[in-house]
């Protein structure tokens, strides 16, 4: 199982989510109305603003601002990380389908044999989303964070 720290300071996961949510387009709007780089829905944005004590100046249009969108999105990923013990599969499923759906899936023995491990995601779109995010995350980790081989200095006279 791939896990993540509770603070979601993992740029690889954030990049994987942004890539699959908006293809790095800060002005993206989904067919359901989600906005910005991390495709945050209106109700979720309002809820996050309240949790961050920023509801007074918050408007849905602020989610087109990359800094605000990433701050809100990474806060939400951190929340999901704490809620789902850093399990990236459950975090990605929760980000895409909602944490309540993940909770319901975990309670169904067809999806989880132990009530903790999400072995089956019953909706195609969320299952595919999770697979794509986890694959991108692993690629980013290998490409950007894996130790690079060091080159031995050439011997003199060689």
Where are these regions (language model features)?
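Catalytic glycan-binding domains that act on GlcNAc-containing polysaccharides
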Residues: 1-158
